[in-house]
């Protein structure tokens, strides 16, 4: 799978406040705000965009592995999925600014799927896990959320740990 370079697409980035966390622009947002911003952008975008939910491991890996860091830098938005990242974000904020919230991948995904009611036509692509997990997840989402539309799913080959 090739990660597209979105830097030449004007407006590809998700409009939100960010702060630098070890060299990466991480969103200062809540799950609700981010899901609304992503849903609105998805409906107006002519191409897919990339969202990373970054915990401390992901950020640290991006710092120490330049190839991985380059992939992170090409994300349209990086959400703080882990309290150490949130704490670092909050240390970057000025006195009086609102505090950053954790925007975990699963919470964000569920909020986006729930938002299909407000944003009909929203489609979702599932990436990661094994094929059995993706099948079970897509089935559960279709059952729980009748408006859920699956654009596709991909289980990449993983290296052994």
Report residues per predicted region:
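N-terminal nucleotide/polyanion-binding subdomain common to many enzyme families
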Residues: 2-102, 109
């Amino acid at each position: 799978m090739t990660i597209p370079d979105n830097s030449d697409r004007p407006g590809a980035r998700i409009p939100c406040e960010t702060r630098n966390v070890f060299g990466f622009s991480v969103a200062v947002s809540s799950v609700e705000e981010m899901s609304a911003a992503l849903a609105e952008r998805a409906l107006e975008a002519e191409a897919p965009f990339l969202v990373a939910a970054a915990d401390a491991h992901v950020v640290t890996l991006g710092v120490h592995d330049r190839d991985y860091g380059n992939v992170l830098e090409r994300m349209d938005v990086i959400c703080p999925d882990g309290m150490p990242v949130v704490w670092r974000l909050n240390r970057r904020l000025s006195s009086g600014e609102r505090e950053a919230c954790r925007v975990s991948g699963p919470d964000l995904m569920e909020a986006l799927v729930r938002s299909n009611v407000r944003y009909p036509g929203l489609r979702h692509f599932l990436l990661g896990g094994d094929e059995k997990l993706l099948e079970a997840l897509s089935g559960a989402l279709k059952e729980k959320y009748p408006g859920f539309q699956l654009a596709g799913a991909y289980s990449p080959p993983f290296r052994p740990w």
